[in-house]
């Protein structure tokens, strides 16, 4: 059991998965350490990796606080997500019930509802995002936690969390901070796992399918070549040595509908699937989601500003660099297959054409930085970071290759930034653009960033593709009929 840091507290959480009642779990919190007279207990409004308000406090009911004599303390709900507790210096425990956030992963959803950040509870399966179950005291997000899950012996916990003690009916975890707890989802289900051992990294694939079939072995076979190619793309330098894929598959044989959702974490990804038990369809969906989410180990998980490092779960300050966190990640996702030789130029051009076409339906007068600073208010425009953001980085990649005679592109840029900063060394949000110019030595990038990231000028796609012997006309991208030696050489550097 953790000892409270000087002047701090330790959270001790416990719950029993075997006592699920009408989709609700009862959670108990006890505290060690010195606490102030008044405390505010909150559940997140939003969590890292999503950009819309989820208000996880809406799933909490019956919250009570007791003093050391077992008498109730005054509790007042301040808003959807927060409660004030009076005379907290005498606080012994808090109890409350948690309802699950979604009943089943399927087509019934609403815009802005990020189910991969939420939870569902069934007797045989629990998809757990800690932000749904466990709250925090304002001012104490850096305090350590102990979490005890009592459970049926039939349930296996798949997670990147490390169990400090384990028995068939109980798992105990010690976590360094609230942020670290929220960064590690858990899938409790009957065991269906497969291990992938690659150079320098060990990956667990844990699955649950409502079809009742075991699918982890097949899914791991899909993921392994993807990870090998991603490692190759990154120069065989991965920032983590352990990783977990948690995959929940809902099979509805009556519906010919395919959906997937995923959310990245530092050492894991949670993927939700709604589709028939069709290995090819599952492969294509998992491949697409897993590729994007795994690249997030670089950014923002490995490279980010203070706005993400010091994340406020209820009043977040947003970074202006979604063009990097999501746009660059998506560019790596679409660039990696052709760069590693598993995709043809024609296939790559088809992917780009789709991005170009979809981008046309979004507001061209909204800059990427303006979207990034107000994503909750601009939910209808948010998806453009995966379209315009990816195509922007394509332009930047070609431009850097041209300026450096092929020696330097966005892969090298991200590598340099991570080397200088990294997971525990956040950068100053407002200084990243000048930092990029200093790192690369290319002052020409100032106009590029002013025009296309901070500004609203149309991306120079046609011009940049022409530099590598590709023609963009009427939404179609095709090889130029008579490319020059210089164009072909730059294309080889790029692809």
Task: Name each model-derived stretch.
Residues 2-46, 129-130:
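Early extracytoplasmic/domain-onset interaction patches
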Residues 1-4, 422-495:
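Beta/coil-rich, acidic/histidine-enriched accessory regions frequently appended to metallopeptidases
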Residues 303-312, 316-389, 419:
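Acidic/His/Gly-enriched intrinsically disordered linker/tail segments
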Residues 194-321:
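Juxtacatalytic substrate-recognition/specificity segment
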């Amino acid at each position: 059991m953790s000892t409270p840091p000087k002047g701090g507290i330790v959270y001790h959480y416990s719950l029993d998965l075997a006592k699920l009642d009408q989709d609700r779990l009862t959670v108990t919190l006890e505290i060690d350490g010195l606490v102030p007279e008044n405390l505010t207990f909150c559940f997140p409004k939003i969590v890292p990796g999503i950009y819309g308000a989820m208000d996880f406090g809406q799933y909490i009911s019956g919250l009570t606080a007791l003093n050391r004599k077992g008498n109730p303390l005054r509790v007042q709900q301040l808003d959807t997500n927060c409660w004030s507790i009076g005379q907290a210096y005498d606080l012994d425990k808090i109890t409350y019930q948690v309802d699950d956030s979604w009943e089943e992963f399927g087509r019934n959803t609403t815009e802005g509802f990020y189910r991969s950040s939420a939870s569902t509870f069934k007797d045989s399966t629990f998809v757990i995002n800690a932000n749904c179950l466990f709250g925090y005291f304002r001012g104490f997000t850096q305090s350590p936690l102990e979490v005890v899950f009592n459970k049926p012996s039939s349930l296996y916990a798949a997670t990147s969390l490390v169990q400090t003690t384990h028995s068939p009916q109980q798992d105990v975890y010690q976590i360094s901070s609230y942020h670290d707890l929220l960064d590690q989802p858990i899938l409790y289900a009957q065991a269906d796992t497969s291990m992938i051992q690659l150079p320098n990294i060990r990956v667990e694939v844990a699955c649950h399918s409502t079809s009742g079939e075991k699918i982890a072995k097949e899914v791991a076979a899909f993921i392994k070549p993807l990870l090998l190619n991603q490692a190759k793309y990154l120069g065989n330098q991965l920032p983590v040595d352990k990783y977990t894929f948690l995959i929940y598959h809902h099979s509805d044989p009556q519906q010919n509908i395919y959906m997937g959702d995923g959310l990245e974490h530092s050492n894991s990804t949670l993927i939700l699937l709604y589709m028939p038990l069709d290995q090819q369809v599952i492969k294509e969906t998992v491949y697409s989601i897993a590729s994007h989410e795994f690249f997030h180990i670089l950014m923002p998980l490995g490279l980010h500003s203070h706005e993400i490092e010091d994340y406020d779960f209820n009043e977040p300050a947003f970074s202006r660099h979604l063009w990097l966190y999501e746009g660059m990640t998506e560019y790596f996702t679409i660039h990696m297959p052709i760069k590693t030789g598993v995709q043809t130029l024609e296939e790559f051009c088809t992917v780009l054409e789709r991005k170009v076409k979809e981008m046309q339906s979004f507001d061209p007068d909204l800059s990427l930085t303006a979207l990034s600073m107000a994503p909750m208010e601009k939910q209808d425009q948010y998806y453009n970071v995966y379209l315009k953001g990816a195509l922007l980085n394509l332009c930047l990649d070609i431009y850097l290759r041209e300026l450096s005679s092929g020696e330097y592109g966005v892969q090298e840029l991200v590598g340099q930034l991570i080397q200088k900063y990294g997971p525990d060394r956040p950068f100053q949000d407002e200084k990243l653009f000048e930092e990029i110019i200093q790192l690369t030595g290319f002052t020409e990038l100032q106009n590029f960033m002013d025009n296309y990231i901070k500004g609203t000028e149309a991306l120079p796609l046609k011009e940049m593709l022409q530099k590598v012997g590709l023609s963009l006309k009427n939404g179609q991208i095709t090889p130029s009929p008579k490319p020059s030696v210089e164009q072909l050489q730059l294309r080889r550097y790029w692809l």
